[in-house]
Amino acid sequence: MNFSEQQLINWSRPVSTTEDLKCQNAITQITAALRAKFGNRVTIFLQGSYRNNTNVRQNSDVDIVMRYDDAFYPDLQRLSESDKAIYNAQRTYSGYNFDELKADTEEALRNVFTTSVERKNKCIQVNGNSNRITADVIPCFVLKRFSTLQSVEAEGIKFYSDDNKEIISFPEQHYSNGTEKTNQTYRLYKRMVRILKVVNYRLIDDGEIADNLVSSFFIECLVYNVPNNQFISGNYTQTLRNVIVKIYEDMKNNADYTEVNRLFWLFSNRSPRTRQDALGFMQKCWNYLGYQ
């Protein structure tokens, strides 16, 4: 093993208090700018590594979701064809579309942050400065996944990239399920995620892997699917070994993994990630850490 137990413990810790303060400053300032435009028609919350408390790199971006609550997209895939026809015959349209929402969001942010604002493919970016970190603001609508005509199975968010790709996610379920997993594993779930993210950055810096081989989201999902009994209280070295071995063996056996939200399969047509990506990453982590 190339690294001591204490080194793994150090890697498992979240970002510093200073970084957390800069994150809070960004959230407060951006929330005020959005409220000035949209009032209480929106819900504003975090998603991603900062929200899930798995961030490890200094000066990382924070993802701020602005969900417009006065309209929603329906997901009718689980309804019968006859129920879909009934729903579509009765539905009404809000008259406010996503292109307008993103444009209004950009305008609201430019009114406050002026030249610090950049429109990106999937978000509006507010660049950081000495007292706030860079933030990606994601305007979106509510998504309602219907299980029957009268029942909503789950609520998430939906938006479109500027190149017209539909994006659906369930950040609230991701957060709550990840927190539950952490509480059930002696708080080791998120700590193992942080360690693997540190190793990922080191492998990228050393030129061992491409910088887009695995995302933070992908790492969180892989570790989430490791059974709770593989997380050993007070033993980071053994737990990390268990996690890497379990994921590697599962990928060789084509195991079905879910996203942390438990509402999508991890390996599906909606995701560019493959089991081969996970296999390759686990092998690189094993070699880098020096397990035998």
From Swiss-Prot:
Its cofactor is Mg(2+). Its EC number is 2.7.7.-, 2.7.7.85, 2.7.7.65. Binds 1 Mg(2+) ion per subunit. It comes from the Bacteria. Changing S169N: Changes substrate specificity, loses preference for producing cyclic dipurine molecules and instead produces more pyrimidine-containing CDN products. Keywords: Antiviral defense, ATP-binding, GTP-binding, Magnesium, Metal-binding, Nucleotide metabolism, Nucleotide-binding, Nucleotidyltransferase, Transferase. GTP binds at G48, S49, Y50, R51, N52, K197, S216. GO terms for molecular function: 3',3'-cyclic GMP-AMP synthase activity; ATP binding; diadenylate cyclase activity; diguanylate cyclase activity; GTP binding; metal ion binding. Mg(2+) binds at D61, D63, D136. InterPro entries: NT_2-5OAS_ClassI-CCAase, NT_sf. GO terms for biological process: defense response to virus; nucleotide metabolic process. ATP binds at Q47, D63, N121, K122, D136. It catalyses: 2 ATP = 3',3'-c-di-AMP + 2 diphosphate; 2 GTP = 3',3'-c-di-GMP + 2 diphosphate; GTP + ATP = 3',3'-cGAMP + 2 diphosphate. Belongs to the CD-NTase family. E01 subfamily. Cyclic nucleotide synthase (second messenger synthase) of a CBASS antivirus system. CBASS (cyclic oligonucleotide-based antiphage signaling system) provides immunity against bacteriophage. The CD-NTase protein synthesizes cyclic nucleotides in response to infection; these serve as specific second messenger signals. The signals activate a diverse range of effectors, leading to bacterial cell death and thus abortive phage infection. A type I-A(GA) CBASS system. This is Cyclic dipurine nucleotide synthase. The gene is cdnE01.
